[in-house]
Amino acid sequence: MAPRRTYQQEMAFLSRVSANQWIVNEGFVPNMRVPGTFYVNKHLETLMFEELQQHVDSGGHGGFLPAVKQLANVACLPGIVGKSIAMPDVHSGYGFCIGNVAAFDMSDPAAVVSPGGVGFDINCGVRVVRTNLMESDVADVKEKLAQALFDHIPVGVGSQGIIPTSAAGLESALEMGMDWSLREGYAWAEDKEHCEEYGRMLTADPNKVSARAKKRGLPQMGTLGAGNHYAEIQVVDEIFDAHAAEKMGVDAVGQVMVMIHSGSRGLGHQVATDALTEMERAMARDGIETNDRQLACARINSTEGQNYLSAMSCAANYAWVNRSSMTFLCRQAFAKMFDSTPDDLDMHVVYDVSHNIAKIEEHMVDGKLKTLLVHRKGSTRAFPPHHPLIPVDYQYTGQPVMIGGTMGTCSYILTGTQKGMDETFGSTCHGAGRARSRNNSRNKLDYAEVLENLKTKGISIRVASPKLVMEEAPESYKDVTEVVNTCHDAGISKKAVKLRPIAVVKG
């Protein structure tokens, strides 16, 4: 066995190529097929390197591998092209680090799909709904509005949905995504236009979703869940790109918006768990070897690979139904509070993006157009202006990208760029990214103090599980502004609008 490398020896494989980008050179871990790269500025890089230093000092023992090692291990997977890429909000996760983008060549029979490259919360994502209200309109009723949202949207760990459906209804929702929401009257036709994939993955096959996953999914439809999921009332704090903002219906600083961050709940988790078990068997059968057993994968064109992609598509559709149901409930709450209609309040969806998903896309690789399976885990699609897969309204601005901050910090709307398309398979960051583990947060932070800090910022908060608040406190995360600025300065996405929270509803 090769002797363990010192921290300095490990760092010799990493090279800075710009103020915001590093390359992980081949040899950092065995069997790398392509280099790795990560986007971090001076401040964010210290977190990456501290994690690596701790790993070396501990003799390689402890929890997850450091993110930079995970990034390099992904670069060893069969069929990977370009680079294994990490965004500035990177932190270690299961198999793939959070913030990882990896693309696999669909024409390569050896190319793989890995559930660890999507994550357990399939199609966890963010939707922003605009209104024509201003901060002054909601100032006096902010507490009531927070309570109304809390009352309307089922939140918390075991929360159950109030959108009535049956087992047959769930099957339809898994197959149809937002088309189901539209048919059942929970969405507007134009909502679909402003949603990635138009809110429906056509590769979904409910027969590939286990009975256990469906059993977990049925009672949770239209629920927010816990952890870092939230519904937030925000106001526009700053406009960086007036043209893009205008296209999004963002007219002025102080305008009220609603941000919904949620995913596929227990159903998505079960789909991932089921697939990992199947894929371990497939790896043994097909002789696929990885550096880390958490990188369980299967050939894209194998039965297991296709089964996973069909089931993952169902979980993605379920998450879009969830966000659509919560949009419906938000619209109801606002309409009731302001004695109006959602239409008169101009409560249109600005855009809805996923940040845990694998999708078949076309990209240029080494000067050739290739069909790739792009895994994005804790990373958001950010297609450039004139891309055929983005709505007509955004053809001149690029695709809107919703970046949720942490509880009590600002959020952003960005737009996609051509440079991002060329360098990161049209991807950018997804949020702030954890700076300390959930366990560490629970041990070091006091929830009463966290809630008090939010109140002093003038933020109304409703929380279903107060003890979980410490895990999601701003102190547990990187600074979202640093993350967004790194992407902006690197040119892989562009800042359009900054949003500030005035009320938070959390699970």
UniProtKB/Swiss-Prot annotation:
Binding-site residues, GMP: 228-232, 355-356, 404-407, 411, 430-433, 506
First and last residue of the signal peptide: none
Cofactor needs: Mn(2+)
Reaction catalysis annotation: a 3'-end 3'-phospho-ribonucleotide-RNA + a 5'-end dephospho-ribonucleoside-RNA + GTP = a ribonucleotidyl-ribonucleotide-RNA + GMP + diphosphate; a 3'-end 2',3'-cyclophospho-ribonucleotide-RNA + a 5'-end dephospho-ribonucleoside-RNA + GTP + H2O = a ribonucleotidyl-ribonucleotide-RNA + GMP + diphosphate + H(+)
Pfam families: RtcB
tRNA processing is among the record's keywords: yes
Enzyme Commission number(s) of this protein: 6.5.1.8
Cofactor, free-text remark: Binds 2 manganese ions per subunit.
Residues at which Mn(2+) 2 binds: C124, H261, H355
GO MF, one example: RNA ligase (GTP) activity
Catalytic residues identified in the record: H430 (gmp-histidine intermediate)
Keyword Metal-binding: yes
GO cellular component annotations of the record: nucleus; tRNA-splicing ligase complex
Broad enzyme group: ligase
PROSITE patterns, per database record: UPF0027
Family per record: Belongs to the RtcB family.
PANTHER family in alphabetical order: RNA-SPLICING LIGASE RTCB HOMOLOG
Other noteworthy facts: Ligation probably proceeds through 3 nucleotidyl transfer steps, with 2',3'-cyclic phosphate termini being hydrolyzed to 3'-P termini in a step that precedes 3'-P activation with GMP. In the first nucleotidyl transfer step, RTCB reacts with GTP to form a covalent RTCB-histidine-GMP intermediate with release of PPi; in the second step, the GMP moiety is transferred to the RNA 3'-P; in the third step, the 5'-OH from the opposite RNA strand attacks the activated 3'-P to form a 3',5'-phosphodiester bond and release GMP.
Function: Catalytic subunit of the tRNA-splicing ligase complex that acts by directly joining spliced tRNA halves to mature-sized tRNAs by incorporating the precursor-derived splice junction phosphate into the mature tRNA as a canonical 3',5'-phosphodiester. May act as an RNA ligase with broad substrate specificity, and may function toward other RNAs.
Binding partners and assembly: Catalytic component of the tRNA-splicing ligase complex.
HAMAP family xrefs: RtcB_euk
Protein name: RNA-splicing ligase RtcB homolog
Organism expressing this protein natively: Micromonas pusilla (strain CCMP1545) (Picoplanktonic green alga)
